[in-house]
Amino acid sequence: MNLLEEKIKSIDIKLASKSPRRHQLLRNIIKDFEIVSKEIDESYPKSLKDSEIALFLAALKAKSYKEEAKENQLYITADTIVVYKQKVLGKPKNEKDAFNMLQELSGNTHTVYTGVSLLFNEEINSFVDATEVTFYDLSKDEIKFYIDHYKPMDKAGSYGIQEWMGYVGVKKMEGDFFNVMGLPLHRLYREIEKIISKKN
């Protein structure tokens, strides 16, 4: 049991996400939690920009659990988006779409935003984290190799930084590495601690 787990042992943690990356990441700071998920309409107002979108969607997911959440249950929801030149790059529709996205990101800097919401005892606390990622110039062969041998289809921006593309394609990064994977652990740890300290 680690330090955070000692503090939250009376709390029922629920990670509301299908993402295997988020499951893997959360286990690094909390071992005992339940995975839940539901389908919701993830459309958002077109007036929202960049970080506001990730924040809105994370909060929207948290609100969807408000009626069923019981006392001392902590729901964690998150949404990750990739933004390049004010354009949101979501999950690719097909391999051609993935190829086009990676060509856009090649040789350029983009921003990854992850919004996180914590629903605890009817109160929702939300935050957003940002990481800037710069890619090397990628050849068409490199992009095709990645798409053929890895799993870009379930990832915003068509790449996973923890996969081959992250090892050979990323030139530099400013911010939380885990944020790019889908869960900003450093900030999440501290935000959970804040909630627990209020409870106590």
Cite the ranges covered by each PLM segment.
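Short loop/helix-cap segments at secondary-structure boundaries that form the rim of catalytic
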Residues: 24-28, 45, 67-68
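Anionic-ligand binding patches
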Residues: 2-3, 9-14, 49-200
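N-terminal beta1-alpha1 ligand-phosphate binding loop
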Residues: 2-30
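A local structural micro-motif
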Residues: 33-34, 200
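N-terminal short leaders/motifs
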Residues: 22, 28-33, 72, 78
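Short, glycine/serine-rich, charged loops/turns that create anion-binding
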Residues: 20, 40, 185
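Cofactor-binding loop segments of dinucleotide-utilizing enzymes, especially the Rossmann-like FAD-
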Residues: 18, 38, 121
